[in-house]
């Protein structure tokens, strides 16, 4: 998994899967990346993210260096989908979702990175989004800050970064399989709970 907000490191964690759904440990979130430029048929990528605190909702952006793909951070799949779909509908930008509602949204319909709004209105919307982002994330300067969102996928930096092609190692420039081992733990049964085996 990816550890850290600005300077990332490789991490290892054991997670449980129940009914096909990964149970996120406390302090972990998901990062999801979708290729949005139509250059290849990449499957959306997802990885565990540690070091962003307890995200209470989702943060989505298409302003994400260097590839500017659609990136979503969060713990709740519904909020993540809501934020992502808001950006898809508006042609890009940034969005915050929490408990099934969009808290704030800045549309950037020009290449997913620029707005055609007057500067004063764009500044007002962006200030609102930045201020409301503290309802979703616990910011801890200097590294875990709102601006760090746009660099979460900057694969030219050292350490692990999720891209539209997969989890990459910034040092080796290789795509890495994030799943190292998988084992099944049987559910407890009455027989397993009785030391006599009766």
Residue ranges and their predicted role:
Residues 1-32, 37-39, 147, 153-164:
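Hard-cation-handling environments
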Residues 8-13, 49-52, 73-75:
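A short linear-motif detector with a strong N-terminal bias
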Residues 29, 35, 44-67, 83-87, ...:
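Catalytic centers of hydrolytic enzymes
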Residues 41-42, 78-82:
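Short, conserved charged micro-motifs
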Residues 70-80:
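Extended catalytic/binding region for NAD+/ADP-ribose chemistry, centered on the ART fold
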